[in-house]
């Protein structure tokens, strides 16, 4: 088996959000949005490095696979496909380097993805001092909107809020991820792999190789598209 691990797979709030969407809490979905939480990019929170030193790191070199699109938009691709339950038809990519001019890789990127019945907007940035609002997933449907709160500490104790009323800033329903914990015996990577090997049951959808190949294809299409500007 080829197994792909994502930190977001182990956030109960993200799984809860997908569960509610699949149950039709906000009706037919037409838009999905996700961006990474606060980040100023690689090496921003440890030992201080000069611009010259940072520029020599592969993270900031496009030819080496650096840049915020591959670093952070990847999370959005796997989550978007999972939440929407569809495969994409096309991807439009945009990238720019606003604050990390010592390298040629982008520090901001976005993907707009077209699905048969929906769209998704996925962002990856190394320029966010403070998000200002929850980075999601945020999902819009015919009956309202759903917001997965970040909750700090990688989504632990986070809520999922559902809005049904027009112009309302107060959610109609609030679900605590504490009430919907990860499955017993499958709450981390090791347990999930052991469970799969012992029972033969499929891995979580976000860890499936085929699903991740679709994510890779979306990123590749986004990179190619961004170079056409």
Say what each PLM segment does.
Residues 2, 9, 13, 28, ...:
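An acidic site on a long C-lobe helix of protein kinase domains
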Residues 192-229:
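C-terminal helix-rich "cap/oligomerization" subdomain common to oxidoreductases
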Residues 13-14, 76-77, 186-194, 216-219:
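A general structural signal for well-ordered alpha-helical segments in protein cores
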């Amino acid at each position: 088996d080829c197994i792909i691990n994502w930190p977001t797979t182990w956030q109960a709030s993200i799984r809860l959000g997908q569960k509610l969407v699949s149950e039709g809490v906000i009706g037919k979905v037409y838009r999905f949005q996700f961006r990474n939480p606060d980040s100023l990019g690689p090496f921003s929170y440890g030992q201080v490095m000069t611009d010259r030193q940072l520029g020599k790191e592969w993270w900031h070199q496009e030819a080496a696979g650096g840049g915020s699109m591959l670093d952070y938009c990847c999370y959005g691709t796997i989550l978007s496909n999972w939440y929407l339950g569809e495969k994409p038809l096309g991807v439009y990519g945009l990238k720019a380097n606003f604050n990390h001019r010592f390298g040629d890789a982008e520090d901001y990127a976005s993907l707009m993805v077209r699905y048969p019945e929906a769209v998704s907007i996925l962002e990856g940035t190394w320029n966010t001092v403070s998000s200002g609002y929850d980075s999601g997933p945020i999902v819009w449907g015919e009956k309202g909107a759903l917001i997965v709160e970040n909750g700090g500490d990688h989504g632990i104790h986070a809520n999922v809020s559902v809005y049904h009323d027009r112009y309302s800033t107060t959610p109609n329903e609030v679900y605590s991820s504490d009430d919907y914990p990860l499955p017993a015996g499958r709450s981390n990577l090791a347990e999930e792999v052991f469970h799969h090997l012992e029972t033969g049951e499929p891995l979580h959808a976000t860890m499936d190789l085929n699903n991740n190949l679709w994510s890779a294809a979306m990123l590749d299409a986004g990179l190619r598209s961004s170079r056409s500007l």
